């Protein structure tokens, strides 16, 4: 009988395959959230589904920030470079085409490939007005990274947005 551990299975694939596996896992995480939301929307309507989802994303933002800090052995986040690194490596962000740039003492985070929105459009649904969910996420995420870290939405549906960027957020100590 052959027994393999998880670690041994991971060691049988290349670094590039590990990266792709991570990206696929991140996409699956958002897929299950999207599928849950569509079913909740059918049962209870969009307003109640959004209210539930906001609570989930607020908790998730805090949990993700704390786990990423632990994974990266960061006790606290002291620089915008740290913020960008955490975002670019986090499972939630990896699957949405993240872009991070630092300009004028601010970190600007953009979503360029929003899989949940694309899936809704493909199903014939309208864009989800997800600004309140993004806000809830950052209400948990930003202070968990650093108590005085602030965020501001530049645009997010239902706001108008460019075709190549779904939402954009400003993060910093302001």
For every predicted segment, state its role.
Residues 134-138:
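Long, well-ordered alpha-helical scaffolding segments within enzyme catalytic domains
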Residues 1-108, 115-117, 121-133, 143-168, ...:
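N-terminal accessory segment detector
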């Amino acid at each position: 009988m052959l027994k393999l551990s998880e670690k041994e299975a991971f060691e049988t694939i290349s670094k590039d395959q590990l990266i792709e596996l991570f990206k696929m896992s991140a996409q699956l995480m958002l897929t299950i959230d999207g599928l849950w939301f569509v079913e909740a929307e059918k049962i209870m309507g969009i307003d109640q589904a959004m209210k539930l989802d906001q609570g989930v994303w607020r908790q998730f933002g805090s949990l993700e920030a704390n786990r990423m800090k632990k994974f990266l052995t960061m006790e606290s986040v002291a620089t915008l470079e740290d913020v960008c690194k955490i975002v670019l490596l986090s499972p939630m962000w990896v699957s949405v085409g993240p872009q991070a740039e630092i300009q004028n003492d601010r970190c600007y985070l953009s979503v360029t490939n929003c899989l949940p929105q694309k899936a809704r459009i493909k199903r014939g649904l309208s864009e989800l007005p997800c600004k309140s969910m993004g806000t809830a996420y950052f209400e948990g995420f930003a202070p968990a990274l650093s108590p005085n870290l602030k965020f501001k939405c530049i645009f997010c549906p239902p706001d108008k947005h460019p075709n190549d960027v779904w939402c954009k957020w400003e993060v910093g100590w302001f």
